[in-house]
Swiss-Prot record:
Protein name: ATP-dependent 6-phosphofructokinase
GO process annotations (BP): canonical glycolysis; fructose 1,6-bisphosphate metabolic process; fructose 6-phosphate metabolic process
Chain residues that bind Mg(2+): 107
Annotated NCBIfam families: PFKA_ATP, PRK03202.1
Activity regulation, free text: Allosterically activated by ADP and other diphosphonucleosides, and allosterically inhibited by phosphoenolpyruvate.
Amino acid sequence: MAKQIKKIAVLTSGGDAPGMNAAIRGVVRAALNEGLEVYGVQDGYYGLYTDRVIPLDRRSVSETINRGGTFLGSARFPQFKDPDVRKKSVETLKKYDIDALVVIGGDGSYMGAKLITEEFGYPCIGIPGTIDNDIVGTDYTIGYQTALETAVEAIDRLRDTSTSHQRISIVEIMGRHCGDLTISAALASGCEYIIVPEKGLDKESLMRNIEDGFNKGKRHAIIAITELMTDVQALAKEIEDRFGHETRATVLGHIQRGGAPCPFDRILASRMGVYAVDLLLQGHGGRCIGIKNENLVHHDIIDAINNMRRPFKEELFEAARKLF
């Protein structure tokens, strides 16, 4: 029989994403309405290790649903891989008699929750919060749609100036090893070429595509590429040297993580926050939440990390490619 849950904690970990505050709010208010006590862990797993734990009430999350970032703070804490660090972190939970933990973040955050679940049998629920949309078991992650809107707006602005100056523009978009954000942003803004990790960078194919565009009468081009694939400044120079056409690279960078979350992310985050509390009250632990075909689902967090594979958006990529 599962232990009765009386106190829970929530933390945000890894890179911030618009909608994290809405998810925290969802967890806190749903838990309070069920008669639970709620604590917030500041600065992610680092705060768990250093005992940065604060009580949360309804006022703590008032006026946060529309705010970007995470008011609890976040941090990357690779030291959490050390078993002694994890042991001390769990002692912090025990100090406050916390019965369960909700973790909002990406795959690194899930790994921390997985280890706490495996090693200490602690009920953890993972909520996917990352603009990269690279978490398995869910169609969308919290923050992705807002980041997409930000990227599209930036590309639209770049197209204005690229058109005016007959310039080739390379736009580097976040996503790490997942091309979802790049593909969707490129499709929505009519980019002439897309380069994503799942397909790799074929420079000769890129050059042929640019040349074909010029032969068809195009006077400018926008190339969307996922971060970490190549030095975009060097690529811009290669293209300019090849065609004698002014080429500039723009790295959108961390601006994609900021700003107020869009309505989709606010709704998704709120639903997932409520669902996390429901799962804990039902006796679930070691689960991660997702959304599939508009329905909330949950998976074993260990299985999600070890065995599940995120499908590549081939249809979207091909649709965008046919519109070059």
